[in-house]
């Protein structure tokens, strides 16, 4: 990861490279920029807000894990708090392509898992595909969300997705990233399972009711959470395992560092993530133990 950052720094404008390097090369950099950090970079570089976000995209793309396509995409979202969150596309050898995570989904779930309750804008290397436009239409801030592309005027999501189909068409009022706590608890004393329940309580699954969460523990002892992000169009839904894997990659860890995993889901759900979670983890490392609980 450090070498990717160094390559991006070498290609960036000197004013940005000089002031960004101490931030992005720090051991505790977590693929996000605070409002204060971003505002300082604006002053130091003399760039406009849009120009700076576009200039930061190569640093987001540095997190890309694309062994199949070798097509590296970065995305940056700004939460309602003003903080910026990086994201990048993620692919998996040995499993079907439906497990792929797009850069927009990565950045959005990154902000979500760090507590944001909505987004004001998203900046992307390339025009968002239909899959991602639909995924973004599930957000609490979809109507106001702005999209910035390199060398293009900023537009609203619904300029890219006119006459959209969304939650309201299915009679659903809840939205992805809205503040929620589903109230699940377990008497299981396993610490990793407890964290998976924590993720489950933040999940969004109004269509199948399969509220679910995943917790991954790595050799470092750190734990990464993933909550299920369901979508009105079904296919763009993002499974809890993928959301957790995104957090792991954006923290600078590697899949081979995963030591154990836990999945918890509602017994009232019309679907289950168990088989896909097991098969994807097995493709990464067949020795990863997976604990499972249905509540």
UniProtKB/Swiss-Prot annotation:
Pfam families: dCMP_cyt_deam_1 (PF00383), dCMP_cyt_deam_2 (PF08211). Zn(2+) binds at residues 102, 129, 132. InterPro entries: APOBEC/CMP_deaminase_Zn-bd, CMP_dCMP_dom, Cyd/dCyd_deaminase_Zn-bd, Cyt/Deoxycyt_deaminase, Cyt_deam_dimer, Cytidine_deaminase-like, Cytidine_deaminase_bacteria. Its EC number is 3.5.4.5. GO terms for molecular function: cytidine deaminase activity; identical protein binding; zinc ion binding. GO terms for cellular component: cytosol. It is an enzyme of class 3 (hydrolase). Keywords: Hydrolase, Metal-binding, Zinc. Its cofactor is Zn(2+). It catalyses: cytidine + H2O + H(+) = uridine + NH4(+); 2'-deoxycytidine + H2O + H(+) = 2'-deoxyuridine + NH4(+). This enzyme scavenges exogenous and endogenous cytidine and 2'-deoxycytidine for UMP synthesis. Belongs to the cytidine and deoxycytidylate deaminase family. This is Cytidine deaminase. It comes from Vibrio vulnificus (strain CMCP6). The gene is cdd.
